[in-house]
């Protein structure tokens, strides 16, 4: 049985206890170690609220959240939880605190009292992993949005987390910046074994995940592999979400009488299916 690193059991949360509306209303989900999970949903669905529970930024009103069996409501476990789960937010400018890239990556390690030699090794490894080593002596404000976000990721990865949560970390980036960041994230997941939970509204990003969770009005309403979720195009659209462009193209071609198989969610699959029909 695969080990579960993040668990929410019957999680309920309101930002205002005086109001009847729950941001999370009975959410039960689990994330397995080494998995890449994308969490989707329209604005206000509760996806970012869920992400903040996995890092103990927010605590349940009722129900439980566990990080490697540590209860997030246990104050004595807070340090260990945040060592286990790192978080990268939407705006990279809000996460950068130093005037030189390598100093920013080292910032948290300095606060933890990591010995200088170990710190140097971790900082260099993290910058190389994130593809920013060549910028190590540059000022962060001179970097592009995608490069800044990779600086933020390197700073988190230097802490050696087992899990990385991205709270719409590519939302403010241009297409090239998004591509750079996602390449880095996939490298962390596939080559370093870091569990990834990506809160996103980009369907093409979600299509590359191992599993997709869809939320609506504080509930989990869909869950499965990208193929299982995005094959249900009508249901996905009813939740005010798009589907990957390849899935949309496949749908239109089928309507035009071209018999393409179900489950096509990326352009490579779509091109291969068309090639098989034409050869």
Labelled PLM ranges:
Residues 117-135:
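Conserved ABC ATPase "signature" region
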Residues 139-143, 147:
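Conserved ABC ATPase signature
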Residues 55:
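Helix-to-loop junction immediately C-terminal to a conserved catalytic motif
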Residues 164-167:
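Catalytic Walker B motif of ABC-type/P-loop ATPase nucleotide-binding domains
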Residues 40-42:
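The feature captures the beta-strand-to-loop junction immediately N-terminal to the Walker
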Residues 63-73, 81:
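Conserved ABC transporter NBD signature motif
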């Amino acid at each position: 049985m695969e080990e579960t690193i993040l668990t929410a059991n019957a999680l309920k949360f309101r930002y205002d206890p005086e109001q009847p509306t729950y941001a999370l209303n009975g959410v039960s989900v689990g994330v397995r170690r080494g998995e890449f999970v994308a969490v989707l949903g329209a604005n206000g669905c509760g996806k970012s609220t869920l992400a903040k529970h996995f890092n103990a930024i927010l605590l349940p009103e009722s129900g439980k959240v566990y990080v490697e069996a540590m209860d997030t409501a246990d104050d004595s476990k807070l340090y260990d939880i945040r060592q286990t789960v790192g978080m990268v937010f939407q705006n990279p400018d809000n996460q950068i605190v130093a005037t030189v890239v390598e100093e920013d990556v080292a910032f948290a390690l300095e606060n933890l009292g990591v010995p200088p030699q170990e710190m140097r090794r971790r900082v260099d490894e993290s910058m190389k992993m994130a593809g920013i080593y060549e910028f190590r002596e540059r000022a962060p404000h001179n970097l592009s949005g995608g490069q800044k976000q990779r600086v933020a990721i390197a700073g988190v990865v230097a802490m050696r987390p087992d899990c990385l949560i991205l709270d719409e970390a590519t939302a403010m980036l241009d297409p090239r910046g998004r591509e750079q960041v996602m390449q880095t994230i996939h490298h962390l997941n596939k080559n370093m074994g870091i569990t990834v939970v990506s809160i996103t509204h980009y369907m093409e990003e979600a299509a590359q995940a191992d599993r997709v969770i869809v939320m609506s009005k504080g509930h989990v309403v869909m869950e499965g592999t990208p193929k299982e979720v995005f094959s249900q195009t009508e249901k996905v659209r009813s939740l005010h979400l798009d589907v990957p462009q390849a899935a949309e193209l496949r749908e239109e071609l089928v309507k035009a009488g071209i018999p393409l198989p179900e489950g096509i969610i990326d352009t490579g699959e779509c091109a291969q299916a068309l090639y098989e029909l034409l050869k």
